């Protein structure tokens, strides 16, 4: 994929919108581009594992590399898949409305009205209708490879490692093969000593907002205009006194920005001076040691797209978030941060500069102290959970032992494979048996027979 193709793909994600039919279709068009690499991935993996000299004992994959699931099923190689959030269709709970991770408003039914819950269920139908072409596209690819459909399981038959934790995620019961292991972060991070100008900026300012939208989000000129205007309003009101912005491709937006707001060096805001690092209140860098910045005491806020890593780092380092998610799991992360009381979620398509400035003011002043308490609360929970990455390594080792010794005897001869030791037995039963429906039918019959006899006696003898 070329750089331009990569940008075009993520622009397509940015243009998607769950609130409109065309926007929902745009999401699945972008996903079709992602999954168009599935045949190549599948063929290369199949060639690799078919060679005894290179056949792996275990596969660790990302959720988008779903060809690994087909390889697992075909070659019986144990698998672990990494997810940035709880998988959408696995381990569903009745108190989690709609499509988990893709809800419009409510993450759980606790504070949702009946109308809200109906709206979430209707949204699921809208998504299913929008993904029609996507489903047909996947089916055709799989047929060409000689594979049938692979419906998503309610419970996994492989190890699922979720880089998140309860407190951010809605708590729910999980099968043994699903493990929250987040936040997965390195024990150390690059210090700010390697960026002396940035370190000096953070030392001479007391209330800095850190702005970063990741490496893939394309910022259109109108959004940059509103962001800068809102940040300048917050600076002028004294809510913040500095802005650090990690933005590597800002030069490309200058011409678009000029057509958006007119001559950018005129008026109250000198956009050119800001983007060219000539405004001493702003420090715009192409790359930033993010964790080192978030760890600085002068950084009081984080304006973020809420990617998986950014969300975990913000929570771990205890920085409240002005959330402006763009696509995918970012949208759910924005809602989660707001629900946890550590941030304010904003709509990337409809926000105003005034709204941004007001939200910055709300978080900085924190009149009730609730944001500070929740930030500290969630930071401590995240710190405790960050040790669970070692549990993930232990569980991988455990699954490898089970796979190695469940299909051969002491002489190394193949025998009937034992069921996966962490898989609950209901996954290998019919739906009727797993839910005891046959047992309930027997109970009903046993109850119905004596009742029928009593009724017959009363009708014919009494």
From Swiss-Prot:
Tell me which domain of life the UniProt entry assigns to the organism this sequence originates from.
Eukaryota
Q: Which InterPro entries match?
A: UDP-glycosyltransferase, UDP_glucos_trans, UDP_glycos_trans_CS
Alphabetized UniProt keyword annotations: Glycoprotein, Glycosyltransferase, Membrane, Transferase, Transmembrane, Transmembrane helix
Q: Which Pfam families match?
A: UDPGT
Q: Identify the glycosylated residues.
A: 350
The annotated pathway is: Mycotoxin biosynthesis
Transmembrane stretches in the record are 437-457
Q: What is its EC number?
A: 2.4.1.-
- GO MF, one example: UDP-glycosyltransferase activity
Q: What class of enzyme is it?
A: transferase
Q: Which reaction does it catalyse?
A: stromemycin aglycone + UDP-alpha-D-glucose = stromemycin + UDP + H(+)
* Membrane topology qualifier: Single-pass membrane protein
Name where it's found: Membrane
The reply on keyword Glycosyltransferase is yes
Q: How would you summarize this protein's biotechnological applications?
A: Stromemycin was found to show antibacterial activity against methicillin-resistant Staphylococcus aureus (MRSA) as well as significant protein tyrosine phosphatase 1B (PTP1B) inhibitory activity. Moreover, related O-glycosides show also significant anti-HIV activity or alpha-glucosidase inhibitory activity, as well as moderate cytotoxic activity against cancer cells and thus are promising candidates for drug discovery projects.
**Is the keyword Transmembrane in the record?**
yes
Can you cite an annotated GO cellular component? Answer: membrane
Please explain the role this protein plays, according to its UniProt record. Answer: UDP-glycosyltransferase; part of the gene cluster that mediates the biosynthesis of stromemycin, a depside C-glucoside with two unsaturated C9 side chains belonging to aromatic polyketide glycosides. Acts as the tailoring enzyme responsible for 3-C-glucosylation of bininalkenylresorcylic acid to yield stromemycin.
The family note in this entry says: Belongs to the glycosyltransferase 28 family.
- Could you identify this protein by its name? UDP-glycosyltransferase
Q: Which organism is it from?
A: Talaromyces pinophilus (Penicillium pinophilum)
Lineage per the UniProt record:
Eukaryota, Fungi, Dikarya, Ascomycota, Pezizomycotina
């Amino acid at each position: 994929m070329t750089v331009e193709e990569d940008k075009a793909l993520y622009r397509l994600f940015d243009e998607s919108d769950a609130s409109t039919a065309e926007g929902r279709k745009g999401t699945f068009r972008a996903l079709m581009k992602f999954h168009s690499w599935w045949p190549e991935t599948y063929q290369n993996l199949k060639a690799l594992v078919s060679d005894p000299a290179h056949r792996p004992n275990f596969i660790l994959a990302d959720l988008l590399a779903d060809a690994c699931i087909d390889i697992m099923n075909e070659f019986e190689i144990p698998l672990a898949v990494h997810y940035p959030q709880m998988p959408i269709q696995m381990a569903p709970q009745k108190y989690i409305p709609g499509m988990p991770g893709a809800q419009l408003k409510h993450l759980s039914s606790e504070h949702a009205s009946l109308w809200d819950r109906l709206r979430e269920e209707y949204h699921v139908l809208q998504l299913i209708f929008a993904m029609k072409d996507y489903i047909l596209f996947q089916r055709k690819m799989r047929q060409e490879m000689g594979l049938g459909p692979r419906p998503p399981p309610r419970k996994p038959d492989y190890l699922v490692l979720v880089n998140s934790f309860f407190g951010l995620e809605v708590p729910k019961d999980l099968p043994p093969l699903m493990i929250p292991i987040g936040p997965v972060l390195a024990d150390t991070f690059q210090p700010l000593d390697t960026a002396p100008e940035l370190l000096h900026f953070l030392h001479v300012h007391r209330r800095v907002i850190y702005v970063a939208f990741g490496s893939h989000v394309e910022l259109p000129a109108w959004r940059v205009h509103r962001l800068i205007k809102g940040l300048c309003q917050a600076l002028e009101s004294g809510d913040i006194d500095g802005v650090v912005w990690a933005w590597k491709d800002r030069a490309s937006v200058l011409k678009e920005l000029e057509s958006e707001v007119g001559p950018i060096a005129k008026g109250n805001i000198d956009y050119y001076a800001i983007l060219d690092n000539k405004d001493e209140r702003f420090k715009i860098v192409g790359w930033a040691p993010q964790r080192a910045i978030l760890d600085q005491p002068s950084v009081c806020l984080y304006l973020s797209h809420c990617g998986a890593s950014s969300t975990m780092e913000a929570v771990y380092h205890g920085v409240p978030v002005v959330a402006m998610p763009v696509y995918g799991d970012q949208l759910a992360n924005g809602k989660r941060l707001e629900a946890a009381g550590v941030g304010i979620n904003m709509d990337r398509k409809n926000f105003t500069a005034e709204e941004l400035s007001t939200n910055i003011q709300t978080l900085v002043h924190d009149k009730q102290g609730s944001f500070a308490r929740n930030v500290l609360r969630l930071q401590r929970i995240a710190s405790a959970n960050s040790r669970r990455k070692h549990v993930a390594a232990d569980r991988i080792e455990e699954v490898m032992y089970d796979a190695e010794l469940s299909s051969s005897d002491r002489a190394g001869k193949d025998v009937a494979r034992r069921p996966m030791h962490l898989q609950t037995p209901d996954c290998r039963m019919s739906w009727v048996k797993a839910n005891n429906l046959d047992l309930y039918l027997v109970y009903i019959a046993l109850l119905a027979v004596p009742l029928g006899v009593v009724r017959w006696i009363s009708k014919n003898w009494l």
